[in-house]
Amino acid sequence: MQQFAVFGHPIKHSQSPRIHRLFAQQTGIALSYEAMLAPLDDFPAFAMAFFQQGGRGANVTTPFKEQAWQMADVLTPRARLAGAVNTLHWQNARLLGDNTDGVGLVSDLHRLAMIGDASRVLLLGAGGAARGVILPLLEQGCRIALANRTHARAQALAAAFQAQGAIEALPYDALGTHTFDLIINATASGLQGELPPLPRSIIRPDCACYDMFYRAGATPFLAWVQQQGAVRLADGFGMLVAQAAHAFSLWHGIMPQIAPVLIQLRQEPVG
C-alpha cells in the first residue's frame, strides 16, 4: 500500500487525512495517509526519513513550507515563484516540490463565482500564504492590490511578481479611494481576532470577501465584513479540499471530484 502523509506542527487539527481517504474511496486507490507531527528543529531529516522508508508523497503545512521548498530537488514553476512548497512527491530517488495552494484557491473562487476576468482583487497580507496564491490569480487576469501592516513587505512582494501581471502595493490608509471586486484575507493573525485596519467604505454588497483560513463558525475577518454589509463571503475550507485534490492528482494521475467530498465534510464538525 502506498504511503502518504501531511507534515506540520501542530498537526492534530488537520483535515488532510480525512480528505485524502475520501478521495481514495472515490477513485478506488488503496493508500495510507497519516498526519505526522514534525519536529521544529530538524524538519528536513524527518521528512527524508519518511521518504527513505517508503513514503511516496506528503503535504506540508505550517511552519515548514519554506523548508520544504529549500529541500526539493526539483521545483514546479509555480512553486519556484511562490517560494514555498505544500506538496512533495518522491520520484526516482528525487524530491519534487509543488505548490497547489494558489490553484486550490482559484478553483474554489470559480466554484463560488467570486472571480472573473480582470477582477480587481485586494489581497491582505504579504507572508507565505499570500505569496503562494499571487501567480494563479495573475494568470486569471486579476489585477491585484497588496496591503500589509508593514508596507515595505507588500512593496517587495509586489515587485517580485511585477513581470507576471498587474500588481501593486497599497498602504491601508490609501484603500478608501479604491473599489474592489474581491477581498482575500491571507493573514493567519485573523484567527486570533486581530483584524487588518481596513476602511469600512471598501466593504460593499457587490464585493465578495474570502478568508483563506477556516474554523468552526465564522472567522473574525468574515464576521467583521458581514457586520459592514458584505453578503458574498466564504472561508478557506473549499480551498483546502481543492488544493488537496490537485496534490492527489499529482501523486496518482487522476483528478478526484471535489464537490462530493466538500459536501460530506461540511456536514462533519470542523476542528
From Swiss-Prot:
A GO BP term here is: aromatic amino acid family biosynthetic process
Q: In which pathway does it act?
A: Metabolic intermediate biosynthesis; chorismate biosynthesis; chorismate from D-erythrose 4-phosphate and phosphoenolpyruvate: step 4/7
Query: Active site annotated at which positions?
Result: K65 (proton acceptor)
The protein's assembly and partners: Homodimer.
Family the entry assigns: Belongs to the shikimate dehydrogenase family.
Gene3D superfamilies, sorted = Leucine Dehydrogenase, chain A, domain 1, NAD(P)-binding Rossmann-like Domain
- State a GO cellular component annotated for this protein: cytosol
Record EC number: 1.1.1.25
The organism of origin for this protein: Edwardsiella ictaluri (strain 93-146)
Q: Where does NADP(+) bind?
A: G125, A126, G127, G128, A129, N148, R149, T150, H151, A152, R153, M212, G236
Catalytic reaction(s) noted: shikimate + NADP(+) = 3-dehydroshikimate + NADPH + H(+)
A Pfam family that this protein carries is Shikimate_DH
| Alphabetical keyword list | Amino-acid biosynthesis, Aromatic amino acid biosynthesis, NADP, Oxidoreductase
Alphabetized InterPro entries for the sequence = Aminoacid_DH-like_N_sf (IPR046346), NAD(P)-bd_dom_sf (IPR036291), SDH_C (IPR041121), Shikimate_DH (IPR011342), Shikimate_DH-bd_N (IPR013708), Shikimate_DH_fam (IPR022893), Shikm_DH/Glu-tRNA_Rdtase (IPR006151)
Tell me the protein's name. Answer: Shikimate dehydrogenase (NADP(+))
Q: Which PANTHER family match?
A: BIFUNCTIONAL 3-DEHYDROQUINATE DEHYDRATASE_SHIKIMATE DEHYDROGENASE, CHLOROPLASTIC, SHIKIMATE DEHYDROGENASE
Q: Give the signal peptide as a residue range, or say none if absent.
A: none
Q: What class of enzyme is it?
A: oxidoreductase
The answer on whether this UniProt entry bears the keyword Membrane reads no
State whether keyword DNA damage applies. Answer: no
| Physiological role | Involved in the biosynthesis of the chorismate, which leads to the biosynthesis of aromatic amino acids. Catalyzes the reversible NADPH linked reduction of 3-dehydroshikimate (DHSA) to yield shikimate (SA).
One GO molecular function term? Answer: NADP binding
Binding of shikimate, residues: S14, Q15, S16, T61, N86, D101, Y214
